[in-house]
Amino acid sequence: MKLKLYEYLGLIIGLLIALEPSYIHPDEHFQTLEPIFTAWTGAKGTATWEFLPENPCRSITILRLYYTPLLWLNQHIFHLKPLGLLYLYRLQNYLLYTAVVIFFLEFCEVSITHKTKAKFFIRTSYVTWVFQSHTFSNSLETIILLLFLFTCQYCIYEVRSRHYATFSSCFLLGALISIGTFNRVTFPAYLILPLLSVFYHCFLSHWIGVAYTAISTALVSALIILFDTKAYSSTDCKSWVIAPLNNLLYNMKVDNIAQHGLHPRYTHLLINLPLICGPIILLFISQKAVLKLPALSCISGILMLSLFRHQELRFIIPVLPLLCASMNLDNFDTFFQAETIITSWLVFNIVMGLIMGVFHQAGIIPLISYFSGEEFPVHIWWKTYSPPTWMYSNPDLTVSTTNFKENVEFVDNIPWHVVSNHVVDLKGSDIELLNKTLTKFSENTDSIQLIMPNTVLDKLTPLQSQWKFITEWETQQHLDLDHIDMPDWTTIKPGLRLYNVSLIV
C-alpha cells in the first residue's frame, strides 16, 4: 500500500518536474527542437554539425514524425510561445513513456508482485522525471526500445499459442528496428541479444517471419532514406542520405569522438550505471536476474556501448526500465534492509530530481523566453550551456561562436557590425576573449548585454576598471556545476545574470 502511494506521488512529481525550466545537455535542443522548429516556423537558429548537408548524421524524417504534430496543433490551436511549446513536448514525452512502460511490463512474463515493485522503482526514479521528459533523442530511443521488446514478447506469445508469428507483428518488429536505428545509431546495440532470442523462439522453424521482418525493415528504411534525401537535397545534398551510416562512420574515428570527450571504457558500467540506479544497484547485484528479453537487451546495450570511448549517462537511460523488469523482486519485502533501501532510494531520487530537474542550468530558458519574438541587442553568452536559439523565435537572428586554430580559441568569425538580434556563444572561453568581444562590439554599438552564471562573478574583476556592468535581469534558479572550483566552496553560487555592459569613459 505504501509503495502504491509513493508510486502515485512519483507520477505527480514527474509531471511537476516536466514543467520546470532545467537544461540538462545542449543535445536536448540542438538534436531535436532546434532544427525542426526553425524549419517549421522560418525562425533563424543554430545549425549543428549533425545536420550539415555535407555529411548529414541525423534523420530529419524521424524528427518530423515525432515533433511536427504538436507544432501543427500549436500553430492552429494553442498558439503558445516557445516556452509553452517546450513544456508541452516534455509532457508529451513523460506521459507517452509512462503509458508505454505499462504495456511493456504487462508482457514481461513476471508476477503481479514484481510488476508492482518494478512500476514503483521506474515511476519514482529521477531518470523518469528528468531524462524521459526532456527532448533527448535518447528519451525517444527508450520509448521505441520498450515498444520493440513488447512486440518481441508478443511474437513469442503468438508462436506459443498458434505456432507462428503473424505478419502484422513481424512487420511492426521490422518497422521499429528501422525507426529506432534512424532515431539513434546506438539503438541496434540494445537489440542484438533480444533478436537472437526471438529468432530462436519464433523464426528458427518459421523462416517466413524472418522474411516479413527483413522486408519491413528494408521498406521503412528506404522510405526514411528517401524523405531524408529529399529534405537535405533542398540544402545542396547531392547523394542518398543514410543518416545512421554517416553517424556511425563519424563515431568510428577517435579524432572525431575526442572533440566531444573521451572516457574510459568502464564509464558506463562503473559510473553511469550506479548514477542511474542509485541505492537499488544493491538489488541488482544481490538478486537473481530473470534472464528474459529486458535483461538480454540491457546486457547487450551496455556491453556494445562500452566499446566506444564517448560515454555519457544519457546513452544508457533505457537500462532503468529494463533492469527493473529483469530483477526478481517477488521476495523484495524479505530482503535484508528493504525499508532502508526504499528510504535511501526515495531520498536519492528527490535530491537528484531537484538538482537535475529543477535547478540545473535552469536560468537559461526563462531568460531567452523573456526575449522570445522580440527585438534585442547583442547577447553575449559566457560560461553557460549553449543557448537554445530556437526559443528566441526570431526570423532575423544572427548566431556566432568561437573558432579554433591548432587548438587555440579565437573570435575571428564573428560579424562585429551586426548589433541587433545577435547571439554570441563564447562557451567557456577565457577572460581575454570576453574582453576582446566586448571591445569589438563597443566600436559599433553601446547596447551590449552579457549573460553569465554567478559561479564566475569573481572572474569579472579584472574588467571592472574598464567596463561598467549593470544587472538588468537575474534569477537564483540556476545551478552551474561546470565552473565549481572545489574545494573552494565560495564558487558554489546559484544564479544567472544579464548585464548591460558599457565602457567607462
Curated annotation (Swiss-Prot):
Glycans are attached at residues 435, 500. It is a multi-pass membrane protein. Keywords: Endoplasmic reticulum, Glycoprotein, Glycosyltransferase, GPI-anchor biosynthesis, Membrane, Transferase, Transmembrane, Transmembrane helix. Pathway: Glycolipid biosynthesis; glycosylphosphatidylinositol-anchor biosynthesis. Its EC number is 2.4.1.-. Pfam families: Glyco_transf_22. The keyword Endoplasmic reticulum applies. InterPro entries: GPI_mannosylTrfase (IPR005599). The keyword Ligase does not apply. One of its GO terms (cellular component) is endoplasmic reticulum membrane. It is found in: Endoplasmic reticulum membrane. It is an enzyme of class 2 (transferase). GO terms for molecular function: alpha-1,2-mannosyltransferase activity. The chain crosses the membrane at residues 5-25, 94-114, 139-159, 163-183, 207-227, 266-286, 288-308, 315-335, 345-365. One of its GO terms (biological process) is GPI anchor biosynthetic process. Alpha-1,2-mannosyltransferase involved in glycosylphosphatidylinositol-anchor biosynthesis. Transfers a fourth mannose to trimannosyl-GPIs during GPI precursor assembly. The presence of a fourth mannose in GPI is essential in fungi. Belongs to the glycosyltransferase 22 family. PIGZ subfamily. This is GPI mannosyltransferase 4. It comes from Kluyveromyces lactis (strain ATCC 8585 / CBS 2359 / DSM 70799 / NBRC 1267 / NRRL Y-1140 / WM37). The lineage of its organism: Eukaryota, Fungi, Dikarya, Ascomycota, Saccharomycotina.
